[in-house]
A protein has these predicted regions:
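Short C-terminal tail/terminal secondary-structure segment
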Residues: 96, 230, 241-267
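Conserved glycine-rich cofactor-binding loop
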Residues: 8, 15-16
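Active-site helix of classical SDR
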Residues: 122, 159, 167
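Residue(s) in the substrate-gating loop at a strand-loop-helix junction
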Residues: 143
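Substrate-binding pocket helix/loop in short-chain dehydrogenase/reductase
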Residues: 97-99, 103-108, 210
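Alpha-helical segment proximal to the catalytic Tyr-Lys
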Residues: 127, 131, 172-176, 238
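C-terminal helical subdomain
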Residues: 183, 202-236, 240, 247-249
């Protein structure tokens, strides 16, 4: 019996990376899926799910537009009879400007996708779950950049800090409903979003340096984040609520320069 047998799940940002890995993982554990992405790659993910024997509906959507988020919830109810899990995973790196040179419009776009998007998922998926009266699980993709400074550009970091607090606020506002809300905080992960970083490292032949600030000394793979999202979505995490779970190889366990300052660079 799979961890999500008999459950219906929505996943956004499912065209690649963590979203695609999660779609495959959730389906393998028995979930019926409604997946969304801004690109046509969502249909490629759907084919992979179907080829593996899963049930899936794929929609091209903008996760920061309310009508699009509502359409995912409607598709879950119309095609599968309800909704048990929502994984608001879509995001963008957004504006790269510093404090003195950022573009307000670009900041607004980053917040629209990265923060308003998850809030819309909480609004619509949460309402559907409350109306059903059988609880549910909402997982939001935040980032270690929302926990500590220095892990991402300003707009991205601010948006992800907002996602973390959104999970806490939503968990409180949904109290007594049986709907849990948690955030997963990836560290450096090899995805479409980080492809420029990995491509640059490969071109410079310095891929061995990626992830060297965390104790595991490597970057994560999307499947490692999918495993955590699956756990938070499943009944195995039934008493975890309003939390931000860092999946970062230990990056946030200490100040990243501590080892170097102490001369403890290896064992």
């Amino acid at each position: 019996m799979g961890a999500l047998d008999g459950k219906v799940a929505i996943i956004t940002g499912a065209g690649s990376g963590i979203g695609r890995a999660s779609a495959l993982r959730f389906a393998a554990e028995g979930a019926k899926l409604v997946i969304g992405d801004k690109t046509a790659a969502v249909h490629d993910t759907a084919k992979l799910v179907k080829d593996a024997g899963g049930e899936v509906i794929a929609l091209e959507i903008d996760a920061g537009i309310e009508a699009d988020v509502a359409s995912l919830v409607a598709a879950a109810k119309e095609n599968f009879g309800g909704l048990d899990v929502a994984f608001a995973n879509a995001g963008i790196i957004g504006d790269m400007g510093g404090i003195f040179d950022f573009d307000p419009a670009a900041w607004a776009e980053t917040l629209r996708v990265n923060l308003i998007g998850p809030a819309l998922m909480v609004k619509h998926a949460g309402k559907a779950m409350v109306d059903q009266g059988r609880g549910g699980a909402i997982v939001l993709t935040a980032s270690v950049a929302g926990l500590n400074s220095g892990a991402g550009p300003g707009a991205y970091s601010a948006s992800k800090a907002g996602v973390i607090n959104l999970a806490k606020v939503a968990a409180q506002q949904l109290s007594t409903s049986g709907v849990r809300v948690n955030a997963v905080c990836p560290g450096l992960t090899e995805t479409g979003m980080t492809k420029p970083t990995f491509d640059y490292a490969k071109a410079k032949e310095v891929t061995h340096k990626l992830g060297q600030l965390n104790p595991l000394r490597r970057a994560a793979q999307p499947e490692e984040l999918a495993n955590v999202a699956l756990f938070l979505a499943s009944d195995q995490a039934s008493y975890i609520n309003g939390q931000a779970i860092a999946v970062d190889g230990g990056l946030t366990s200490s100040h990243p320069v501590t080892r170097q300052l102490l001369g403890q660079t290896s064992h």
